[in-house]
Amino acid sequence: MNRIIIDTREDFEFNESHVDGAINISPSVFATGKIPPELASTPKDTEIIVYCRSGQRSNTVGQILRMHGFTNIVNGINEQHVTKRLNEAV
């Protein structure tokens, strides 16, 4: 299954720990109003799981992605929730 996992925390938080395979794109990148290069060629129906520490930043990023036409956004809340979700999917 094709999916993208985005950790929306700051670089230092991502560097401490993150979900395997996640890419780090902070909300400030999305605040420019443009889609980051990492997502430029991503099909709009690709599953995109976003997470942060508490779900607030990931919720904001999810809303921005929806405004850009992405249709399969999952707010994974935090690293632990995403890890659990991925383990259950196996």
Locations of regions flagged by a protein language model:
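Rhodanese-like catalytic fold shared by cysteine-dependent sulfurtransferases
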Residues: 2-4, 8-49, 53-90
